[in-house]
């Protein structure tokens, strides 16, 4: 390449052709003594030695900057991550902090972050809008920061009392550090931590609009470009000096350059002049913007208003009718049909359609077109609200739900106010009478269908709301309005509805009543004589008991309903309500007389879920009444399956795609019961395991040596085996561990230890306090544990005693003598205990006919040896094969046939005798 191109002063040409430059060879030099050639990059860059303090503080300031950015955008997850990194970085800088003290910018961040988190925590509306991850991160960060700030409490308090002093101290420190550092380092390196934080704090608030900010940024960019062009002469001078010194001696590169005081002052003066010019331009621009803003305010007459992009400030109402059009019922009906034509079509704005219908209803009301038109429009508004979500799984938003409730209330108000109006699905649109008041008004529609859809939407809202949030509680308050709507519809249909419609609305009322415990009725039952009769009468007149209401509604359905499904649901709800209020015998008799257990497998899944819930409630009721065996039998099917959560409609279990695809999973999710109707699964399992313990432990003691002993509860045995497999047993913690520990104590006849494991503070909080009459249930449990422990003790140690007094047994188990007498008498009658009662001495005399433990072991050994011999003979016969002849045609494995053949052979004395055959085989082996 020509050397002409290498002579230019342009920096770009120098960098591109630096590789082509020809350097003079040294005279007499060898290959090993070539001169050291430094690249331009190495020549330009300067080595900067930074102290450990600067490194650590820069790391802290970078993390603080990231945290403040995350605070601006409310990214709590990022805040939490960076705060944890900041704590680790502060620990790394501990040696420097011990020498220099805690930096003020660190204290400032802790204080600001604490105030920021407290402000967010108190903002309940803002917390609701947060997503799940941000809300969780906010809670975690708040706890960690409060714990972390305890070490810096004094410094934070001092900073909050006088933050200005802290800023002044920081400034003094920064000035000292600037004076101590070299001017070259100050010009090349970035800001320190305190400078950065000070700059961030002193920045003016964002009071101007985005457009003004953009203009300011453009002006700054232009000014910076002007400065760059202005400094071009300096750069060209430096380039020329570089070219002149290019071929100088290489040793001069490593010599220290002497900088005079005059050169340093000239550089500083030039910097100050540039800064003053820049500040002057900024002040001038601010003054111009202030004048423009005042002119705009004077013209507009007010402040700026923040608007959403693309949304007009004034929303014009759509014109329903042309100007001057006379509003009559036919015209309104025609316009209604025009609006409904777009319903269901692709691209239709459903929200706009609802607004049009509401606007049309307002126009009809303004022009007094009659209640018939209003009812017809409101029916269509309700239908449009229900059609707003095309997806079945999507639930109504809160604003739509409120519109729905208000519209139904308005509709019922109109129907109650106009007794001459008839509505029904059987009315054809051509035969409707919407405005002729001389005849009864007739409108096509079904109020019951709207109410059933409203109830379905309410269920979907509850299913899709987090049950542990305040939003769920707020939504649950709407159930009172839903029940009020159903009750009003019930009154209306009782007057004008058919029998089928009355049964349907009665079932809706039942479904909102059956699972609720009537505390007022319960208190009236437990009321003492301290209350006067007038007070009791007043309490009874306030509201109808739920038991009376359920009885009246269900009996009407039993008598009038023609569909099996409504009657089945009513029976199950009635049984559930009886069981919930401890009416065990009524609930049991109704279940047995209905024969639902015979054909419930043919019902649809929601009815099966209701049946499972009813059986569980029936079992819990039997347990509260002390009927342990009935409780165990009622809960056996649900608990033994291991799918109680799924069978009760309270959640889905993890399954593979082969067992359940996504579509089936969506369908099953729609069948789930809302959270406020759930049955406590831990209470259910505890009731089942305690019932199994009270039945299984005495049975195991009575049949300890029985090889063919059956299991009453497989799940209970599984829990016992799990407890036995543990190498080291500590104190019980979970509910299951408490029941297993109580079972082991009952095996030994130690009823007090068993009671302490079943009834304690932990179990009371988890299970027993959830019952309405908790004290009565605990008393029943203690009595049952005493009785079953007595039976277990007699089964286990009867072989030890010749006789024992009933008084001693009563003292051991703290039972009355008649109770002990009753228990022992039942055991003797059922032939469970081989003994007799001596009435005069109140003594139980053991017969001693039962084998001892040694004898039982010997019997078991003999039985196992007999089985072993029989198996060996069968295997031996199988290995020898079958011989021809009459005697070998049968099954040789059948012992009865073999015995018959052996007897025949012994009688006949033939060659097939077993002894002869064995002798022949023995000789052949030799």
UniProtKB/Swiss-Prot annotation:
This is Eukaryotic translation initiation factor 3 subunit C. Residues 165-189, 217-243, 289-302 have a biased composition (Acidic residues). SUPFAM superfamilies: Winged helix' DNA-binding domain. One of its GO terms (biological process) is translational initiation. It comes from Xenopus laevis. Residues 207-216, 258-275, 889-911 have a biased composition (Basic and acidic residues). Residues 1-36, 158-309, 880-926 are annotated as: Disordered. Keywords: Cytoplasm, Initiation factor, Protein biosynthesis. Residues 675-851 form the PCI domain. GO terms for cellular component: eukaryotic 43S preinitiation complex; eukaryotic 48S preinitiation complex; eukaryotic translation initiation factor 3 complex. The keyword Metal-binding does not apply. It is found in: Cytoplasm. Component of the eukaryotic translation initiation factor 3 (eIF-3) complex, which is involved in protein synthesis of a specialized repertoire of mRNAs and, together with other initiation factors, stimulates binding of mRNA and methionyl-tRNAi to the 40S ribosome. The eIF-3 complex specifically targets and initiates translation of a subset of mRNAs involved in cell proliferation. Belongs to the eIF-3 subunit C family. Component of the eukaryotic translation initiation factor 3 (eIF-3) complex, which is composed of 13 subunits: eif3a, eif3b, eif3c, eif3d, eif3e, eif3f, eif3g, eif3h, eif3i, eif3j, eif3k, eif3l and eif3m. Residues 8-21 have a biased composition (Low complexity). GO terms for molecular function: RNA binding; translation initiation factor activity; translation initiation factor binding. Its main location: cytoplasm.
